[in-house]
Amino acid sequence: MPERLGLVARTRSAPGVLNKLTGVIAAHHGDILSVDIAGAGTPDARVYFEIALLASPSALVADLEALDVVRDVTVVDTLQMIYGKRIIIIGGGAQVGQVAIGAISEADRHNIRGERISVDTIPLVGEQPLAEAVRAVARLPRAAALVLAGALMGGEIAEAVKEVRAQGLLVVSLNMAGSVPDVSDLVVSDPVQAGVMTVMAVADTATFSLDRLKRRKF
């Protein structure tokens, strides 16, 4: 079974650095699960990898550090291990805040028992900004569920919801005007309860399952 590990390579900022790093990882049969670059354009860039690796990481680290563009390499805990699954809450500020109360309170219960769930929020208004934000959630690392919190959402936002659901993202909507509730996985009237149920739906330490529900609107 491959081990999932995190690596931070401190490198020079230059064209072709990522190509050299990934070439070494491929030579060690590492499967790159995630990559992020911090400090690009500065003298010291930091390239973070999450890799599935069958062998010990020591040989991989040594070969990476042998590259002329690499200053040093550190093995770190993965962001999956530290922050875990992400709940993304988008919409009107008042509703987002109430959903966050429920989500954070429920996540606390599961994280105490060894789960890792984090909660991200962004208050937004307007059909186009909201639709763009919904589509972007599918590109966020470790995003497990999206909660749409507002009084009226439809049109392009509903189309965006269909797209991200087709990519496997769980979408929960408050009971609101517009077509978004009609295309979401779960509709909840109370915002605090919406946050609670979303966390329960993604937590490995919970017995709650959407597949066992006889209805999807509460």
Describe the predicted segments one by one:
Residues 1-90, 96, 106, 121-125, ...:
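A conserved regulatory-domain signal marking ACT and ACT-like small-molecule sensing domains
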Residues 73-76, 81-209, 213-217:
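Conserved mixed alpha/beta catalytic, RNA-binding, or beta-rich assembly cores of soluble enzyme
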